């Protein structure tokens, strides 16, 4: 028995000893504590096992032979959470790298306890706050990387204490203040990369004390003053990168003494004077960028000494004189850009010696002479742009035979002769632009092999012959411009093969025959102009299939017959010109559906019947409504008074009768209103609009008189000749139209054009009665709470205007006081007659709102579909929308900063719920202040999901609808046409700017056109932050100003031009919460704490 006990004791002792041996050492436990503050969503740190004896084999850990941890490298592991200073318990730690993760929070001050640290890399995370002064106590530090975070404040002036520092990389933050002169103490510093911040002041001359400096990168800041001459002391400097600042003065000749310089990037500043000849002493120069300054004078011939240069860009200056032939000595040159200067003389044939040249752009100058034959032998030339000069003669015949072109643009010159045949020999040509020259002959059939071509622009020449059938094999063509030539023949049915075509211009030629019905295959076409030809026949109804078209011009031909009703399906049309043809019949009533139309030209035809009252629905008409010189009869519809933006109205030379509607006299935008030569009676309405117009606009109506005269007498016509219209009237009215557009329409055209050019095709209508599809009618068809359709009619007084709460793109919202005393909001969606978007909105909104519940989301009580009425029943918000509240005057605005802060946080939480907690994820698509509704306590509720997009909803018909409202639309949508949650975040950032500034999202054109640009411009112009804040707010409270400044930063994060740089909504909620929780005031001004422009990723900072 005793022996057994002894044996058992030995076993237990051995087991205990084994455990002691296998237990994790102190450094391993420190790392596990450090890991506890991180979220390892991808499991990269799964090898960090507490059962190991030491951490030396763990992922990202490096040790000495004595198993002491010296390096923690967690780069790119998708980690989030916060950075714990517990890591400094690793006393042998020399390197800490957590870059390219999602770690947030401030940089811990206690990192200063890492006394042996040599490398600290926190780049590309979500760190915010200031750079802790305590970091300057780590005197062993050699490399400090803090780039691509959200740090603000200034560089600690104690930075000079880091005597061992070799590399300081802090670009892409929101740092401000001056470059501290104490950096002169950093004798071992080799690299400074501090671009894309908000540093101001001058470049300190003391920086010349950094005698080891090789790279000085301060691009994209707000630095001012001249370039310090003391920089010549930096004899080790290879890269001087100062682009996009506010530097001015002349480039000092002393820059030529920095003998090792390889990169000199001074572009996008305000440098004046000439390019110093001493720049030719920089014989090691590789890249020289001086573009977008105000440089004058001639390019020095000494430029030819830069024999190792690969890229030289002097574009967008005011340089004069000849292009130096010495450029031909730089045999390594790959890029030469001299465009947009005032350069004269011929193109030097010596450029033909640059056999490595890839890109040559000499456009927008005053160059003359011929194109040197030598250029056609450059084997690596891919981009040649010579447009907008005074070049003449023939294009070299072998151009393209030896060169692998992708872009070739020689437009806007005086080139003559035939088009050479070898442009696309290597099948890489993407753009060929030879327009606005004097080229003659036929379009070369050799282009039939150019499958790569996307843009072919040969307009405004003297080309003859017919359209080569081979052109229609170029399936990648998106733009075909052959206007204003002498081309003839029929339009081939093969035109329909170009299914990627977006722009087709065939105007001002001699084409005959009919437009082939295959034109309907061009379903991506945006602009189609075939005006001023000899085309006959009917306008093909198949044009109604070109649903993306925005500009259609068929004027000045010989088209006859009725106008196809199908043209009313082109709901994206902005400009429709059918004038000067032989069209008969009535104006299609379906034209009332073209609600985006800005210009409608139907004059000079044989149209008859009445003017459709539906034209009054074209409330976007602005440029012109011209239905003159036809055979129209009946009265002028009173509905034309709805065209509140219209500037030019031509109704003259018809057979119209009755009186002039008083509503037209109230169109304050009207510049021209010609209703002469009709059968109108009565008096001209005595309004300011008509008072400023000449009486000739009303002449030729024998029963019409001017009310301003004491004795009302008929107005005498100036001319009633239809022939006068056909000969010169059309041109005269066009001239008047253009003049008025220039004077009165620049801003509004830009405003509407920017908004509508980014809109996409609406889907075909799908009947709501179809209940076979899930998530559409099954769950929510019957309204909740016992509401009936008749009850809703009674509660809204038959949808009276008196109870209208608001109007939107999808419908009108009414206040409904139900018989039981409950108040709700009823949204009546637009009828099908206004397009399918209403029913798509109905379906998407139900599918979305019916499934979610959140305190900051507007509740959907139910919906009702009755005959053709689609009704949504919402929770009533007594305080209306945020937009309405912000638009009130100073005395009526009920929103102090505390209320605005709570609204910002509540709306952020609602949007965060949609993005992160709904399955599938919901993207709102139309976040704006008018869609953030307020209850009686001013609590925010996100509403109006008429444009909502469920990422995975198979049956949602709103997926290709336009995303957002003008002023709120993310910039990337214009070219990607894709909607992501980042678009919502951009829009929400605009809402935050509205809350802070009190300004609407759309600003005058001279101020940038939208609120984001206005704020960015104010910051760049050093406007004090407090002057950007809403004047109705109390800015005497420091805490309030501090919170507003922080929310302004958040807004600028959200409205970053790069979607990848925008935070998630969870991060936005966290930042807004932290803004109020912050206890200390920032000492720096926000005026320059935010990067406002994204740099090209290929450029160094």
From Swiss-Prot:
<feature type="signal peptide">
    <location>
        <begin position="1"/>
        <end position="23"/>
    </location>
</feature>
<feature type="glycosylation site" description="N-linked (GlcNAc...) asparagine">
    <location>
        <position position="529"/>
    </location>
</feature>
<dbReference type="Pfam" id="PF00560">
    <property type="entry name" value="LRR_1"/>
</dbReference>
<feature type="repeat" description="LRR 11">
    <location>
        <begin position="308"/>
        <end position="329"/>
    </location>
</feature>
<dbReference type="Pfam" id="PF00069">
    <property type="entry name" value="Pkinase"/>
</dbReference>
<dbReference type="InterPro" id="IPR013210">
    <property type="entry name" value="LRR_N_plant-typ"/>
</dbReference>
<feature type="repeat" description="LRR 2">
    <location>
        <begin position="91"/>
        <end position="115"/>
    </location>
</feature>
<feature type="region of interest" description="Disordered">
    <location>
        <begin position="1076"/>
        <end position="1101"/>
    </location>
</feature>
<feature type="glycosylation site" description="N-linked (GlcNAc...) asparagine">
    <location>
        <position position="236"/>
    </location>
</feature>
<feature type="repeat" description="LRR 16">
    <location>
        <begin position="427"/>
        <end position="450"/>
    </location>
</feature>
<feature type="repeat" description="LRR 25">
    <location>
        <begin position="644"/>
        <end position="667"/>
    </location>
</feature>
<dbReference type="InterPro" id="IPR051420">
    <property type="entry name" value="Ser_Thr_Kinases_DiverseReg"/>
</dbReference>
<feature type="glycosylation site" description="N-linked (GlcNAc...) asparagine">
    <location>
        <position position="161"/>
    </location>
</feature>
<dbReference type="InterPro" id="IPR001611">
    <property type="entry name" value="Leu-rich_rpt"/>
</dbReference>
<feature type="glycosylation site" description="N-linked (GlcNAc...) asparagine">
    <location>
        <position position="728"/>
    </location>
</feature>
<feature type="compositionally biased region" description="Low complexity">
    <location>
        <begin position="1078"/>
        <end position="1088"/>
    </location>
</feature>
<feature type="repeat" description="LRR 7">
    <location>
        <begin position="211"/>
        <end position="234"/>
    </location>
</feature>
<feature type="repeat" description="LRR 21">
    <location>
        <begin position="548"/>
        <end position="569"/>
    </location>
</feature>
<keyword id="KW-0677">Repeat</keyword>
<feature type="modified residue" description="Phosphotyrosine">
    <location>
        <position position="968"/>
    </location>
</feature>
<feature type="transmembrane region" description="Helical">
    <location>
        <begin position="735"/>
        <end position="755"/>
    </location>
</feature>
<feature type="glycosylation site" description="N-linked (GlcNAc...) asparagine">
    <location>
        <position position="490"/>
    </location>
</feature>
<feature type="glycosylation site" description="N-linked (GlcNAc...) asparagine">
    <location>
        <position position="631"/>
    </location>
</feature>
<feature type="repeat" description="LRR 17">
    <location>
        <begin position="451"/>
        <end position="474"/>
    </location>
</feature>
<dbReference type="GO" id="GO:0004674">
    <property type="term" value="F:protein serine/threonine kinase activity"/>
</dbReference>
<feature type="binding site">
    <location>
        <position position="827"/>
    </location>
    <ligand>
        <name>ATP</name>
    </ligand>
</feature>
<feature type="repeat" description="LRR 14">
    <location>
        <begin position="381"/>
        <end position="402"/>
    </location>
</feature>
<keyword id="KW-0732">Signal</keyword>
<feature type="glycosylation site" description="N-linked (GlcNAc...) asparagine">
    <location>
        <position position="39"/>
    </location>
</feature>
<keyword id="KW-0812">Transmembrane</keyword>
<feature type="glycosylation site" description="N-linked (GlcNAc...) asparagine">
    <location>
        <position position="78"/>
    </location>
</feature>
<feature type="glycosylation site" description="N-linked (GlcNAc...) asparagine">
    <location>
        <position position="57"/>
    </location>
</feature>
<feature type="glycosylation site" description="N-linked (GlcNAc...) asparagine">
    <location>
        <position position="404"/>
    </location>
</feature>
<feature type="domain" description="Protein kinase">
    <location>
        <begin position="799"/>
        <end position="1081"/>
    </location>
</feature>
<feature type="glycosylation site" description="N-linked (GlcNAc...) asparagine">
    <location>
        <position position="97"/>
    </location>
</feature>
<feature type="repeat" description="LRR 3">
    <location>
        <begin position="117"/>
        <end position="137"/>
    </location>
</feature>
<feature type="repeat" description="LRR 20">
    <location>
        <begin position="524"/>
        <end position="546"/>
    </location>
</feature>
<feature type="repeat" description="LRR 15">
    <location>
        <begin position="403"/>
        <end position="426"/>
    </location>
</feature>
<dbReference type="Pfam" id="PF08263">
    <property type="entry name" value="LRRNT_2"/>
</dbReference>
<dbReference type="GO" id="GO:0005524">
    <property type="term" value="F:ATP binding"/>
</dbReference>
<feature type="modified residue" description="Phosphothreonine">
    <location>
        <position position="788"/>
    </location>
</feature>
<keyword id="KW-0067">ATP-binding</keyword>
